[in-house]
């Protein structure tokens, strides 16, 4: 990446963190350039989230030094990090769903007027101006519960920007988004990058990493094993860095032969919201059955209905070709569901 020390906005030196005898981070050195997107990759358990939580003050590092804009910093907690220019948008959004957009934006830092009362007019004005600059049209009075995951995520990013953040960490932000929503998110990220804000983008999705990132770093077993410009690396090199070996066959042939149907779901519908409608599928013995969908699609509700937690409105569940009757929760467990 050359000599770019004058462009470094965030520098981590020798960061280590252990939980008991488990060494999660081992003397990590990482630089993030101003006005760039740094992709952070690694297998599950590599240390990505722990590293960012140490940066954000959620965890306290055991060793190491953090420099922000050339100055050494050590945050006592997330509030301290936010007030000093580092924000983090978690994969699981931390929002009060029953409150509106404005309340969530100013939660914990409500402005007050000369009488010591919450200045709601100022809050709305500042929120409107913030979303205008971001090119977003948002109903400020709308409860967060009524917004899509994508809209809620954009609001969380707007909140991070409202702290005048220099660095924003995005922890797998596209895991619950559609292709169109990902495009909107990337447009916003490019706009922030052009404004000089640096972003750390955690993801497992290679195509997205190469589309949006300027630099890419890889963690493996708590060690930083690679940092390169996105233009100077490729997918195979990233995979090798992540797993620690060359994968000769990324998609080996499957020779497993599933046997007879062991679980059959027929025309399953639920009685209460969120509704399931006419769900039918079979699971065979010795088969790994994948269940895919975005947040809110009904995956959890489906499994809870099969297990007997939710009430069925229609449909049947068959185990070993015999209908299952749910009278209480102990029955499914006795039937090995």
Question: Where is each model-derived feature located?
Answer:
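Glycine-rich phosphate-binding loops of nucleotide-dependent enzymes
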Residues: 2-329
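Single conserved hydrophobic/aromatic residue that forms the stacking wall/gate
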Residues: 328-337
């Amino acid at each position: 990446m050359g000599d770019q020390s004058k462009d470094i906005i965030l520098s981590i030196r020798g960061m280590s963190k252990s939980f008991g005898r488990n060494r999660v981070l081992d003397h990590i050195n990482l630089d993030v350039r101003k006005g760039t997107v740094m992709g952070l990759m690694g297998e599950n358990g590599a240390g990505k989230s722990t590293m960012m939580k140490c940066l954000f003050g959620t965890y306290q590092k055991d060793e190491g030094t953090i420099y922000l804009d050339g100055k050494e910093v050590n945050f006592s907690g997330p509030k301290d990090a936010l007030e000093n220019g580092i924000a983090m948008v978690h994969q699981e959004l931390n929002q009060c769903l029953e409150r509106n957009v404005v309340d969530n934006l100013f939660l914990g830092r409500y402005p007050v007027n000369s009488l010591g009362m919450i200045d709601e007019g100022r809050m709305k004005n500042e929120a409107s101006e913030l979303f205008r600059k971001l090119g977003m049209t948002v109903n400020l009075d709308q409860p967060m519960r009524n917004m899509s995951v994508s809209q809620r995520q954009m609001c969380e990013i707007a909140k991070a920007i409202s702290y005048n953040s220099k660095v924003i960490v995005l922890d797998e932000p596209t895991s619950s988004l559609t292709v169109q929503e990902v495009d909107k998110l990337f447009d916003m990220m490019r706009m922030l990058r052009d404004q000089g804000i640096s972003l750390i983008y955690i993801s497992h999705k290679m195509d997205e990493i190469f589309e949006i990132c300027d630099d890419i770093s890889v963690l493996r077993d708590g060690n930083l094993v690679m940092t390169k410009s996105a233009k100077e690396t490729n997918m195979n090199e990233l995979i090798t860095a992540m797993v620690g070996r060359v994968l000769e066959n990324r998609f080996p042939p499957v020779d497993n032969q599933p046997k007879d149907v062991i679980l059959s779901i027929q025309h399953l519908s639920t009685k209460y919201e969120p509704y399931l409608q006419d769900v039918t599928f079979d699971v065979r013995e010795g088969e790994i059955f994948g269940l895919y969908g975005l947040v809110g699609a009904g995956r959890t509700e489906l499994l809870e209905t099969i297990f007997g937690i939710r009430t069925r409105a229609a449909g049947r569940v068959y185990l070993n070709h015999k209908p299952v009757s749910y009278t209480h929760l102990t029955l499914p467990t006795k039937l090995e569901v």
